[in-house]
Amino acid sequence: MRALWIMAVLLLGVEGHLMQFENMIKKVTGRSGIWWYGSYGCYCGKGGQGLPQDASDRCCFVHDCCYGKVNGCDPKDDFYVYSSENRDIVCGEDNPCTKEICECDKAAAICFRDNMDTYQNKYWFYPSSNCNEESEPC
């Protein structure tokens, strides 16, 4: 029951395009991004520090790095256009900045799908106090 309450609170914090990212993850992996990756390891969810704990957490680390390279728009608020067919995502956008956001999200969703076998429940709601190592450069 506590986990459901926490997920409800996390959903309240999802704004703008982050719901698009949630939908994209669900289309590519068949899983809810908020439920499975909303608070996972050292990088999935809000913030990020230390070293990624496994390949799934590394997907979030790389996603954070990708967002850090986006210039001219806000990756967490700006909307983009994409289509999907059979779990394939096509970012279709005239605006190069929002297309870049879409490509970051697409890469993360594919990474989650390709690394689903690395997901470990012990990293779900992993305490940030365990993420004290020096972070890798992007």
From Swiss-Prot:
Pfam families: Phospholip_A2_1 (PF00068). InterPro entries: PLipase_A2, PLipase_A2_Asp_AS, PLipase_A2_dom, PLipase_A2_dom_sf, PLipase_A2_His_AS. It comes from the Eukaryota. Its main location: secreted. CDD domains: PLA2c. It is found in: Secreted. Keywords: Calcium, Disulfide bond, Hemostasis impairing toxin, Hydrolase, Lipid degradation, Lipid metabolism, Metal-binding, Platelet aggregation inhibiting toxin, Secreted, Signal, Toxin. The keyword Calcium applies. The keyword tRNA processing does not apply. The active site is at residues 63, 105. One of its GO terms (biological process) is arachidonate secretion. Disulfide bonds join 42-131, 44-60, 59-111, 65-138, 66-104, 73-97, 91-102. Its cofactor is Ca(2+). GO terms for molecular function: calcium ion binding; calcium-dependent phospholipase A2 activity; phospholipid binding; toxin activity. One of its GO terms (cellular component) is extracellular region. Its EC number is 3.1.1.4. Expressed by the venom gland. Residues 1-16 form the signal peptide. Belongs to the phospholipase A2 family. Group II subfamily. D49 sub-subfamily. This is Acidic phospholipase A2 Ts-A6.
